[in-house]
Amino acid sequence: MSFFYSSAYAADKRNFDEIDRSGFNSFIKKKKNFDEIDRSGFDGFVKRNFDEIDRVGFGSFIKKSEPHH
C-alpha cells in the first residue's frame, strides 16, 4: 500500500512540476506587463486623485479634529 501511494505521489509531483513551470512562466510574463501598465498609468492616476482628496477632504478632517482653545 505504501509503495503504491509513494509512486502515485511521485507521478503527481512530476506532473505538477511540469504544469507549474509552464503556468508560472506565463504568469510572470503577465505580471511584467501589468507592472508596465501600473507604472505608466495607474500610479499617476492614483497619486493625482489621492493628492486632490488629501488636500480637500483629509485636510479639513484634521482641522475639524483639532481641539479649540
Curated annotation (Swiss-Prot):
Keywords: Cleavage on pair of basic residues, Neuropeptide, Secreted
Cysteine pairings via disulfide bonds: none
Propeptide regions on this chain: 1-12, 29-32, 59-69
Compartment(s) of residence: Secreted
Record's signal peptide: none
Domain of life according to the entry: Eukaryota
Chief place where the protein resides: secreted
One record GO biological process: neuropeptide signaling pathway
GO cellular component, one term: extracellular region
Its biological purpose: Myotropic peptides.
Similarity field: Belongs to the orcokinin family.
Protein name: Orcokinin peptides
Species this chain originates from: Rhodnius prolixus
Upper classification of the organism: Eukaryota, Metazoa, Ecdysozoa, Arthropoda, Hexapoda
